[in-house]
């Protein structure tokens, strides 16, 4: 697959070994002293060493980032950023590393706490937009799509809630999509992150918000997942499959400008309380949410089925594909296989009901006292 540059929604350099152009990216953004932000899992690979080898000067690395990052992770990163007088961030990793890196560049000179910039109304206008430092993103997973997003998700450890922090300038200025960086990803994380990409594209397509641009991107993203995720899972060295999955991941993040839904609003509280992998919980909830919403989404599911070339363009056949895909990826069938979902059922139901992405879930407010949410969370 040839190297190519895209300019939507930001500058994207796509292709094998494009990590070697990191110094050029820094120069284009006038970053002279970048802080590399990643997680400890990435440190166990040679990716950061390879990245530093491509820079004129060795960069300091901040890696105190949890798999479900917290506000404290951002605070510590901001401290490191300011103490060492950095002037930009290179965010490397999956969603945790990229979300944290973006937030560090955003928060470095803000005077308000991070929770004051939650994605509610015009709260983003509270920020000093002129003080946000430039960001370069290098994803090492194909799932979260944080590299093409204007938001980051963090757990507030005091309230055990996941919060979406948003600002238009949190969108990285340059994204390097190098499929070689996803080769070290183990099979289970390939599955989890790939299902996250599918959830983004699927929920975006099914959202009731009018956004035809995102609609088209979401549809093609679903097709790329169908044709490539199992290939990448079975053979992590399959560079073509890795390339297509990396593209679908970024496409999913672009698409969900149209909205998400109950898969994500259910996954957020589970991850906040039990620290589960976000993509895994999305994958577990997916068929239950689709079945629950069947009446309102069946026509769109038929359209998807036809586009991705399923043998029969029906809702039931699409569900069969989702279940088969989960089975091929060794995804647990029920939530009770990964958590004890009885202990915090009421709390999680309330959190899901009030999650900001639930507003595009077709039956979000249909049942009183969160009965619908309890029903989905209580699946055995």
Residue ranges and their predicted role:
Residues 72-79, 83-177:
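Glycine/threonine-rich beta-strand-loop-alpha-helix active-site module
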Residues 23, 52, 75-78, 102-105, ...:
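Predominant activation on well-ordered alpha-helical scaffold segments within soluble catalytic domains
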Residues 360-369, 380:
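Conserved small/polar residues in nucleotide/adenosyl-binding loops
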Residues 1-88, 335:
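ATP/NTP phosphate-donor binding region
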Residues 273-345:
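Gly/Pro-rich interdomain helix-loop hinge
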Residues 151-258:
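Carboxylate- and glycine-rich phosphate/diphosphate-binding segment that chelates Mg2+/Mn2+
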Residues 143, 251-276:
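Glycine-rich phosphate/pyrophosphate-binding beta-alpha loops
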């Amino acid at each position: 697959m040839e190297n190519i540059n895209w300019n939507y929604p930001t500058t994207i350099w796509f292709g094998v070994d494009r990590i070697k152009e990191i110094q050029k990216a820094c120069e284009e953004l006038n970053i002279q002293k970048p802080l590399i932000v990643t997680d400890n899992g990435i440190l166990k690979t040679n990716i950061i060493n390879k990245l530093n080898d491509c820079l004129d000067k060795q960069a300091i690395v901040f890696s105190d980032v949890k798999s479900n990052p917290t506000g404290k992770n951002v605070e510590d990163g901001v401290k490191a950023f300011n103490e060492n007088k950095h002037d930009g961030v290179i965010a490397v990793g999956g969603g945790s590393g990229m979300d944290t890196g973006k937030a560090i560049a955003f928060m470095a000179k803000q005077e308000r706490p991070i929770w004051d910039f939650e994605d509610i109304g015009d709260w983003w206008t509270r920020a000093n937009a002129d003080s946000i430092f430039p960001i370069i993103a290098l994803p090492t997973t194909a799932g979260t799509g944080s590299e093409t997003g204007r938001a980051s998700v963090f757990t507030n450890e005091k309230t055990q809630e996941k919060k979406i922090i948003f600002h238009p300038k949190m969108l990285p200025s340059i994204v390097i999509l190098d499929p070689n960086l996803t080769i070290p990803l183990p099979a289970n994380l390939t599955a989890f992150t790939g299902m996250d990409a599918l959830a983004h594209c699927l929920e975006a397509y099914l959202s009731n918000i009018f956004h035809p641009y995102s609609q088209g991107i979401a549809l093609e993203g679903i097709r790329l997942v169908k044709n490539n995720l199992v290939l990448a899972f079975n053979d992590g060295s399959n560079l073509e499959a890795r390339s297509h999955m990396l593209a679908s991941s970024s496409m999913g993040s672009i698409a969900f400008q149209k909205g998400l839904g109950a898969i994500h609003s259910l996954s957020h509280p589970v991850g906040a309380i039990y620290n589960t992998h976000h993509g895994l919980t999305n994958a577990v909830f997916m068929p239950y949410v689709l079945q629950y919403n069947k009446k309102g989404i069946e026509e769109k599911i038929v359209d998807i089925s036809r586009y991705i070339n399923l043998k029969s363009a029906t809702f039931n056949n699409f569900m069969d594909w989702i279940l088969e895909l989960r089975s091929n990826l060794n995804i647990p069938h029920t939530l009770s296989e990964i958590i004890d979902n009885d202990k915090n059922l009421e709390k999680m139901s309330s959190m899901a009901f009030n999650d900001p992405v639930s507003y595009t879930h077709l039956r979000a407010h249909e049942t009183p006292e969160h009965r619908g949410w309890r029903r989905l969370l209580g699946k055995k």
